[in-house]
């Protein structure tokens, strides 16, 4: 995706320390990089995709805003997308989990539980999605 500003030249280095920076967000239980941010080198006009899972006691809007603030400050760019996994659609969650790189994990048991449930739902959903797309667009 083309954005207005280039990523900082040291963004790769900043990505390596993003996990510890997310520790500041007390409501974030775990976080992932996904999409283009998981492959090196990032293109100058790329964005950084981050997914976080928030504790149930945290207001989802406030937790997302706090995570966005920490990520943008740490990376020194506004070219970020932060997804809250608690409310993300099944298709998006599954695609995030397929390319994820764990950058922060405050609760490994909760993360494994989330991943196993979300991937089961996603694989069930994909069967339905493929059938729907085949009916809609045909087989070729």
Language model features: what each stretch is:
Residues 1-30, 38-40, 44, 55-140:
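Catalytic core of pol beta-like nucleotidyltransferases
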Residues 47:
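ATP/adenylate-binding site constellation spanning eukaryotic-like Ser/Thr protein kinases
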